[in-house]
Amino acid sequence: MDTRLLNAFVVLADTGHFGEASKQLCISQPALTKQIKTLESQLDIVLFERGRHGAKLTQEGQYLLNQAQVVLRESHILEKQARQLVEPQKVSLYAGFGLSSLSFITSLLARFNQIEPNISVNIDDMSSHKMEEKLLIGELDVAFSRLPVMPPLQGIALTQEQLMLAIATQHITVLEADYNPLHYFDSLGLILLAPEKGKKLYQQIHAFLQQHKLAPRLLQQSQDIQTQLALVAAGLGIALVPKSAQLICDKQRVTLLPLSGLYTQWKIGVIWNSNIKNKERDL
């Protein structure tokens, strides 16, 4: 069976939308539709219910999804091990990272390069949810992301992240050490990060809003934190972002106010798949 078809199946199941899935796969929507129909024909099973709101897994599709993920995982591991046998002198590690690890990952990689100059490290920026997916199927050897994680993934905490309220400096009315910034939710709309771009952060933000009984006016969804901050800087609303966003925000126009209470802090660490052995990673 063509693993490309299985990969298309898994990505579409994850996104639930042909447009988003085709972007991730770098193919056209008609090509993706053809791949899914080909797989359904081969299996003689309807995997998705198509509708105006996207693609939803059928009961049969849901049942087969886990098996498809297992096959892809083993396929990636086999390909990687085969490459290492053919070219054992070329050793590479593949690492995922996000904004929350940006403050320390460069110095960490520089130190690793001094210790192991013959091992190249390829890094890729992605969401924590995507990192976990790629670790599970063997596409990443290690990731620097949020904790905790579920087995077989394991992690060690390296630093702590905090939820902040990003607000245009022009909108700030009071800046006192003991002042609660939650009142800004009453007057300013919220600019959210699209859930598919940061699923865990999106879930945490909603948990925070529910915990504090906040129901802000939702203005729009952004595809990345940089765009969120740009919209905030323009005075179009407020946003909930990790503290590490201070590395990329316009500090003259945007102020980050710390939030306290439940769902405002989480740990960032190094994560790996304990089911996949890798001597270079485990050095």
Predicted segments — roles?
Residues P151-A157, E161-Q162, Q226-N275:
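Beta-alpha-beta core module
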Residues N66, S107-R111, D124, S128-A168, ...:
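Short beta-strand-centered segments that line the small-molecule binding cleft or hinge
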Residues V86, A157-I191:
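Flexible hinge/capping segments at coil-to-helix
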Residues E40-L57:
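A short LG(V/I)-centered, amphipathic sequence patch enriched
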Residues L188-H212, N278-E280:
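Secondary-structure junction motif
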Residues Q42-L43, L64-V86:
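Alpha-helical linker/hinge and terminal dimerization helices associated
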Residues Q29-P30, E87-E116, S120-D125, H129-E133, ...:
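N-terminal winged-helix
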Residues V10-S28:
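Short helix-boundary/capping micro-motifs
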